Amino acid sequence: MSDKEFLDLAESTINAIEAAMDRLNDEDLIDVECKRSGNVLEIEFIDNGSKIIINSQAPMKEMWVAAKAGGFHYKHQGGVWINTRDGSELFAALSALASAQGGADITL
């Protein structure tokens, strides 16, 4: 994957995550505020102040996620972002992390 392909893919992934969180917020399933700064998306859970931070790491061609449960790295393989340690998929993992931190069962 070229640098441009990675940057385009990372941008569309972050946009999709932000849109999904905004949709869940609009549907009153979870109370979050998303803040975007360049390649970093910060999701704050209003009820408890906890955060999930997602950013792209162009030199590594990875997406990184920081949450209360820890830090996670994802590489794009076979059309999805896969955790480099446990093989979990990014959106499934974010659903579980956001459910735990937000106190509601949600699916991105």
Where are these regions (language model features)?
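N-terminal intrinsically disordered, cationic/polar leader segments
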Residues: 1-53, 57-108
